[in-house]
């Protein structure tokens, strides 16, 4: 049963990473994927926030300081960014050390502003952890909030249509 749970969790994360990568999902597709992946903790019609950021010294850290390989560093970053908040569900997409995205989805009813505020507070906690454990700085490029996952999917559709 644990393998199924781990597989389902991995598939849930992959779905959200697809959205972070810019997959142009329509409302019906989002609903169908969330149903099939048994995602009761989040609702697609609630506001979401997406942050784009980088670790300016990430390549140096990976090459010169971190001795455990890229995969373990990614796992350590996911442990920092995807945990620690009872009110929000977070998914980290590591494109490379110079480009990462974090999606924040509320586990409870929140306004768009509350979701954006929760994302900012979470990133502040993550920054403190990165500095404490790895002496790394976080360079936040932007935080964008959306009315819903559907709105994020629509924006992706418009962006990829050009």
Task: Give each language-model segment a name.
Residues 92-97, 128-140:
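Catalytic core regions of nucleotide second-messenger enzymes
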Residues 77-78, 115-134:
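Alpha-helical scaffold within the catalytic cores of cyclic-nucleotide enzymes
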Residues 1-107, 111, 148-162:
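Interdomain helical linkers/hinges and coiled-coil/dimerization scaffolds
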Residues 121, 125-128, 142-148, 155-162:
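Cyclic nucleotide signaling catalytic output domains
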């Amino acid at each position: 049963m644990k393998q199924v749970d781990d597989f389902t969790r991995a598939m849930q994360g992959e779905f959200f990473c697809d959205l972070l990568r810019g997959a142009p999902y329509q409302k019906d597709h989002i609903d169908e994927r969330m149903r099939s992946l048994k995602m009761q903790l989040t609702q697609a019609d609630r506001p979401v926030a997406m942050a784009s950021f980088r670790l300016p010294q990430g390549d140096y850290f990976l090459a010169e300081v971190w001795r455990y390989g890229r995969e373990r560093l990614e796992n350590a970053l996911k442990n920092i960014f995807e945990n620690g908040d009872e009110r929000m569900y977070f998914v980290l997409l590591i494109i490379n050390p110079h480009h990462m995205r974090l999606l924040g989805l509320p586990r409870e009813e929140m306004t768009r502003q509350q979701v954006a505020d929760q994302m900012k507070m979470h990133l502040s906690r993550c920054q403190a952890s990165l500095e404490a454990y790895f002496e790394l700085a976080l360079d936040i490029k932007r935080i964008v909030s959306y009315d819903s996952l559907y709105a994020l999917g629509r924006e992706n559709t418009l962006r990829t249509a050009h």
